[in-house]
Regions:
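Well-ordered alpha-helical scaffold segments within catalytic/enzyme domains
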Residues: 329-345, 391-409, 454-468, 509-525, ...
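Extended, well-ordered alpha-helical scaffold segments
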Residues: 257-293, 342-361, 405-425, 467-484, ...
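Aromatic-lined, polymer-binding surfaces characteristic
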Residues: 385-389, 445-456, 486-489, 495-511
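Short Pro-Gly-centered flexible turn/kink motifs
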Residues: 231-255
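Active-site lining segments of carbohydrate-active enzymes
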Residues: 376-380, 398-469, 484, 534, ...
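Glycine- and aromatic-rich loop/turn segments at beta-sheet edges
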Residues: 287-320, 360-381, 424-444, 484-501, ...
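Low-complexity, Ser/Thr/Pro/Gly-enriched N-terminal "stalk/linker" regions
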Residues: 22-46, 51, 234, 252-321, ...
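Beta-strand/loop-rich accessory regions of lumenal/periplasmic or secreted enzymes
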Residues: 40, 53-68, 72-236
Length: 676
């Protein structure tokens, strides 16, 4: 441990010495202000930074034209970190949009870019209908799209990064009548913009206030709209102060860049747990109502209806889904364990009925789960996914282990799972990956390896339960693939099934998979897998909010007091927040102890506390029709999945996986106990 700390200190010093201190000066900084008279197109004025030799400010920002505002700027700090503070006073009533550009000393083509929870590398895994280099090599976005209001430029060639981060209280938001073009805000907003631009071949940080988005604004799933530029009103005589922080550091690669950026943003924002009265016991008591009211028993396989529900009614539907957004089998195990502990015979009876019915009617001819069934439409999904199949096996292994501990045996279930795990061995590619989707005859539908880590978990558990080393070796090969193709390349993508892009779940699953193997191995192997888990964990963490997004009056999420810190952005394609966590909190606690990194445990507590806020119950239904049906698509920025926009949910949701995720968060230590 002493040697590790010494090496860490040496590397940190090398990072400091390896970067020339950024110089903020007129030769690499430009600024402009746009002024709008209602009913007229805005006029944009370039600004000149005039150095002041005395007084309270370092620079005055002036134009060739007489402006109805005075602009002054201070630059404080030394070395790698500098704060830029802009002071503005209105000489007349004005509507304005201010912007600034800071050039790096790197070629744009040599750089990768990072906007936490939204932009990784060049977003080339994302479709052209979402923000990516497919559309443009320069992007400006609203700050509330990002888990930290930061943009980082990583110079791959010279192994260094430069970032800009907004520093503010973020207390206000205002509604607008339009979502594109020049828009005048209905009140005060705290939200500015941040991003990167290619300025004559040089990678450039761009930032300003209030928000604007260019070259497009991302308003809905797979929908890019024309750019938007907001205008804030400043009354004559009023002043405004805006602050940003510029930070430079050395970084070995993009993974190191993201790691350092997350540590820096965590230390800068210092997120604290959200105060809530919802204890673990209260949470489970309320959530257990989902097991009661969603239960469907008039179909061959009994299930919890947790997919494609309407938030306005939460009426049960005909869709039974094993994993992914349904998570019927994991919820059945949770209900069984909880029901027996609380002497709730109804929960126990229904959970056992689900497992019994799936054993009899839940499999395809080849022995895979019928992972999605639409009963009224008489439709069974013929394309299997390694993710849903894996999540089903995972849940049943927990069930079998629990039953065995209570003296109950299920040889038919064990036979079924052995058949499935053996099929996994057949599906696995020579490089260790698993195809994302396949058919009953093992022919491939989607050969992408993005969902591979989902298979690692049941393979490790299957090794422990069945004492079959083949499953452990397959798990090791799968993480070997993750190490080579995802972790070492910092390229986490397409783990989820409803989007093809950079996403949170890919890095979260990769970190969790390596963690499972670390628990199942010893010595150098264990240390190696622990290191991989940590490396991937920084990418997963980067999707979770370190700050509280402001909402406007009339936006429900703001009116009920939602604090966004600790919630996770989903993906580039799906720009909303949710409570996807499962046992990643356990991973963070374990890594915190393993590497003496207190940030992991501290932020895990932020996540755990924050994700309790929207618990729907009598008098606090949070826009959901039924108690315990926790919301899924929580829309916190100018984007929606299809309906309702910022401050609300999409009208359709899948509480099945949400309840399962929160339940695992509230049940710490599960896998460590399983693998003992």
């Amino acid at each position: 441990m002493i040697l590790r700390k010494l090496l860490s200190g040496i590397l940190g010093l090398a990072g400091i010495l390896g970067v020339n201190a950024f110089e903020y000066a007129p030769f690499n900084v430009s600024a402009s202000i746009a002024l709008k008279v209602p009913g007229n197109m805005a006029v944009h004025y370039p600004l000149i930074l005039n150095k002041l030799s005395n007084g309270n400010f370092d620079y005055q920002l002036v134009s060739d034209h007489k402006l109805p505002v005075l602009l002054y700027q201070n630059v404080t700090g030394e070395g790698q970190t500098k704060q830029i503070s802009l002071w503005m006073v209105a000489l007349e009533d004005v509507y304005f949009n201010f912007g600034e550009q800071v050039k790096s000393d790197a070629r744009h083509d040599d750089c990768l870019f990072y906007m936490p929870g939204f932009w990784y590398r060049r977003n080339l895994r994302s479709p052209k209908e979402a923000p990516s280099f497919h559309t443009s090599d320069s992007w400006l976005v609203r700050e509330d799209r990002l888990s930290t209001p930061m943009t980082t430029i990583f110079d791959e060639k010279n192994k260094k990064s430069i970032s800009v981060t907004r520093i503010a209280e973020f207390e206000d938001e205002a509604l607008t009548t339009h979502k594109e073009g020049e828009v005048i805000l209905s009140g005060k907003t705290s939200i500015g913009y941040t991003g990167f631009e290619n300025v004559s071949g040089t990678a450039t940080l761009s930032f300003g206030y209030p928000y604007k988005e260019a070259p497009k604004t991302y308003i809905r799933k797979l929908t890019l709209a024309p750019s938007v530029e907001a205008y804030q009103f400043l009354k004559k005589g009023e002043t405004l102060t805006l602050t940003w922080e510029i930070h430079e550091t050395a970084a070995e690669d993009f993974s190191d860049c993201v790691k350092q950026a997350w540590e820096y943003s965590y230390d800068l924002y210092k997120p604290t747990p959200v105060e809530t009265s919802y204890t673990d016991e209260i949470m489970k008591d309320v959530l257990s109502n989902f097991f009661v009211e969603s239960y469907v028993d008039d179909t061959p396989t009994k299930y919890y209806s947790g997919v494609e529900l309407r938030t306005a009614t939460c009426e049960n539907l005909d869709v039974a889904e094993v994993g992914f957004v349904g998570r019927t089998l994991l919820n059945a195990f949770n209900a069984l364990e909880y029901g027996e502990g609380k002497q709730r015979a109804d929960l126990v009876k229904n959970a056992n009925s689900i497992f019994d019915s799936y054993l009899q009617h839940g499999f395809s001819e080849a022995g895979f789960f019928n992972e999605v069934v639409h009963y009224k439409r008489n439709f069974v999904e013929k394309n299997h996914s390694i993710r849903r199949q894996s999540e089903g096996v995972y849940a049943v292994l927990y069930y079998l282990n629990y039953e065995k501990q209570h003296g109950r045996k299920h040889p038919e279930w064990e036979k079924r799972l052995k058949t499935m795990l053996d099929a996994f061995l057949k599906l696995q590619n020579p490089d260790g990956s698993f195809p994302r989707k396949f058919k009953d005859d093992f022919s491939l539908v989607d050969k992408s390896g993005g969902s591979t880590p989902s298979a690692t978990l049941p393979l490790v558990m299957g090794y422990k339960y069945f004492k079959d080393k083949r499953y452990l070796e397959a798990a090791k090969r799968s993480v070997g693939y993750l190490e080579k193709e995802l972790i070492s390349k910092a390229d986490y993508f397409s783990s989820t099934l409803d989007a093809n892009c950079e996403d949170k779940e890919a890095s979260l699953y990769a970190s969790t998979a390596a963690y499972y193997l670390a628990l199942a191995t010893k010595g150098q192997e264990r240390a190696h897998y622990a290191g991989l888990a940590k490396k991937a964990a920084y990418f997963a963490l980067s999707w979770y909010y370190t700050w509280d997004v402001p909402f406007a009056k009339g936006q429900m999420l703001g009116d009920i007091g939602l604090k966004t810190r600790g919630w996770g952005n989903v993906s580039v394609e799906n720009n909303h927040i949710d409570v996807f966590i499962f046992d990643f909190a356990d991973v963070l606690h374990w890594l915190s102890k393993e590497f003496n990194e207190p940030r992991f445990t501290a932020f895990s507590e932020v996540i755990s506390s924050s994700m309790r806020q929207l618990l729907p119950h009598e008098g606090h239904l949070c826009g959901i029709a039924k108690k315990g049906f926790y919301p899924e698509v929580v829309q916190h920025t100018n984007w929606d999945y299809g309906k309702n926009g910022k401050g609300y949910y999409n009208d359709i949701f899948a509480p099945g996986w949400v309840v399962a995720s929160l339940w695992e968060l509230l049940s710490p230590g599960r896998v460590e106990n399983f693998l003992k």
